[in-house]
């Protein structure tokens, strides 16, 4: 059931979940149905990772990576995302960037640097935000919080299909191993570990189509 956001604030629906749970696709579909904006928070972490990789920074250099996040030069233009003036939409979906992003997402300095940048996306008429801690940390007063789950094998198959469709080589066994490692990092990190907010609706999409999952979210919103 939807709840009221803070007085004067635009309504927010948060969709959190592990890697390749479908949250990005669902967030975009729900936002389109409602005529709202969408925030892909994972893109900000991937952009930070890409910027750090371009500078040759190891993922273990927390202060340097946090400084990159603080000064991140990004621009979103519809489906396109630009890093330092260059279209980075393809690069940020590479597995190397995703694994780096998962590591640096545990750093308090990186998370704090990106926090207000994420909150700035909250504008009328409303926002659908997807990520890992949107409901628990970034938008704790969200009108509706969804935590999307799916079994890891299904998620690995989805990611493999997505990468191949984008012309990126992918190996299912490697993806499955990386995904299990990423899940462990995300759930065990000290800062904002991956977990549903106390008032979130947990939605298992393992046996659902995209359309069925979108409708389930909209049903929660309209309830």
From Swiss-Prot:
The keyword Transferase applies. InterPro entries: Cytidylate_kin, Cytidylate_kinase_dom, P-loop_NTPase. ATP binds at residues 17-25. GO terms for cellular component: cytosol. Its main location: cytoplasm. It catalyses: CMP + ATP = CDP + ADP; dCMP + ATP = dCDP + ADP. Keywords: ATP-binding, Cytoplasm, Kinase, Nucleotide-binding, Transferase. GO terms for biological process: nucleobase-containing small molecule interconversion; pyrimidine nucleotide metabolic process. It is found in: Cytoplasm. It comes from the Bacteria. One of its GO terms (molecular function) is CMP kinase activity. HAMAP family: Cytidyl_kinase_type1. NCBIfam families: cmk. Belongs to the cytidylate kinase family. Type 1 subfamily. This is Cytidylate kinase. It comes from Bordetella pertussis (strain Tohama I / ATCC BAA-589 / NCTC 13251). The gene is cmk.
